[in-house]
Amino acid sequence: MPNSRLHLISFDIPLPADYGGVMDVFYKIKALHEAGIAVILHCFQYRERKPQAELEKYCAEVHYYPRDLGPLSILSSQPFIVRSRASKALLKNLLKDNVPILFEGLHSCAFIADKRLEDRLKIVRMHNVEWEYYRNLNALESRFWKKIYFAMESKKLQLFENQVISHANIILTISPDDTAYFEERLEKQALAKPPRIVLCAAFSSQYGC
């Protein structure tokens, strides 16, 4: 689709592409660029990862935002991985136009229910069933406060997942098992306008979908 534009919100800076989640994001960006889509990339900078000039080769715009890792993000009713990425600067940039938005993971979906984005095409890439992942972390953790955090985050993510499903137009799943899971969730929620679920294998140097 020549001359098309797309906002892509990444939970992390997708270069270097050195772990599964960012590999999927980076090679997806390359594939979109090669398809003639102008990607407006939004990504969150934290830990040791730094802005990467190479991303400008494949994106029309690249925006970086800090995560809010303070106690209010932990105590929020939203999951910490979501609330810490609820950047007002990000929302301001999303509201500059009316083009579709691709949210990478639940992490990036802080504003999916915002009424000002109600008429936008919203696509959510599910990298896994996030609340189950945190439940498994809780089971493996021995430190008391970490166990509490993982247990709370798992419950928050399960509730937040319902909100995301009810506001997304398209859900991209990464595996047949995840596809079956989200199809079952849709049956239980019985939404008036359910999102379309599309299985899209992880992107790599050979690309996905």
Features from the language model and the residues they span:
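N-terminal subdomain of nucleotide-sugar transferases
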Residues: M1-H63
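Short, well-ordered alpha-helix to beta-strand connector turns
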Residues: G36, C59, D97-N98, D119-R120, ...
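A conserved catalytic-core segment of Leloir-type glycosyltransferases
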Residues: L41-N93
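Short, charged/polar "capping" segments at the starts of alpha-helices
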Residues: R47-A53, A110-I112, T179-F182
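Acceptor-binding helix/loop patch of EC 2.4 sugar-transfer enzymes
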Residues: L69-Q78, K122-L159
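Short N-terminal targeting/anchoring amphipathic segment
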Residues: K92-A110, L121-I123
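Helix-loop-beta element that forms the nucleotide-linked donor phosphate-binding surface
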Residues: R116-R120, N162-A202
